[in-house]
């Protein structure tokens, strides 16, 4: 099993450009696995972890409802935002500057073949990062992501998850609000959940955050949880 993971911080990158890059990496892993099956070989598969930020964009998962986008295309243009229907799970979400978007493109057969464990590890990496800043976050039963004050009227989400998995190869991932402009979430019903709010690390701590520092903490927790070697 190859537990080496190539890490790339892509910085601020167009959503479609990054999506195409993910698809190329994802397809490359699947091709190796297909060849191994057909030829009864054991060629190692690569693993990748991408961090990035996106210009303002809304994405709708394959099980989502377009009615959860509350504004029209003209309004999106006026706010410098775009909209994409994509092939991950989940409903609608927002990406923008100040948000850490993580795309683990992993052959889970190098780690473990349990999609629920995979999602819980992604959530746990964010929960542990928030703990580093003195914040106590949690999961919400029946919902993915990372939350504060679950079960109260002030329940609010700081990290959303949406992944695709095929033959144990993952793509897409998580969106962690650090210095995000939360007003953009007002244009959607985030993740299709009507009665919940969203928040950011900046809002919780009342100050602009060093996003590079947050990325480093997050990466450290991912490395430990998945027992990976960054290359």
Enumerate the predicted regions with their spans.
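N-terminal lobe of the biotin/lipoate ligase/transferase fold
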Residues: 1-155, 209
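Long, positively charged amphipathic alpha-helical accessory segments at protein N-termini or as interdomain linkers
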Residues: 2-10, 110-158, 163-231
């Amino acid at each position: 099993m190859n537990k080496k993971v190539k890490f790339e911080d892509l910085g601020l990158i167009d959503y479609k450009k990054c999506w195409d890059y993910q698809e190329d990496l994802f397809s490359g892993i699947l091709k190796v696995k297909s060849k191994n099956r057909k030829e009864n070989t054991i060629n190692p598969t690569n693993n990748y972890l991408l961090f990035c930020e996106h210009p303002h964009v809304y994405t709708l998962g394959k099980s989502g409802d377009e009615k959860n986008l509350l504004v029209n295309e003209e309004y999106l243009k006026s706010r410098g935002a775009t909209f994409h229907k994509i092939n991950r799970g989940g409903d609608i979400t927002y990406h923008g500057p100040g948000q850490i978007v993580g795309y683990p493109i992993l052959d889970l057969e190098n780690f473990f073949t349990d999609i629920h464990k995979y999602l819980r590890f992604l959530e746990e990496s964010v929960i542990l990062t928030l703990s580093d800043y003195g914040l106590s976050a949690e999961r919400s039963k029946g919902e993915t992501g990372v939350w504060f004050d679950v079960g109260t009227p002030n329940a609010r989400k700081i990290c959303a998850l949406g992944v695709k998995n095929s033959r144990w190869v993952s793509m897409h991932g998580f969106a962690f609000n650090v210095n995000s402009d939360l007003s953009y979430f007002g244009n959607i019903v985030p993740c299709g959940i009507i009665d919940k709010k969203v928040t950011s690390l900046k809002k919780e701590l009342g100050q602009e955050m060093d996003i590079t520092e947050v990325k480093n903490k997050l990466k450290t927790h991912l490395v430990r949880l998945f027992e990976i070697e960054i290359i």
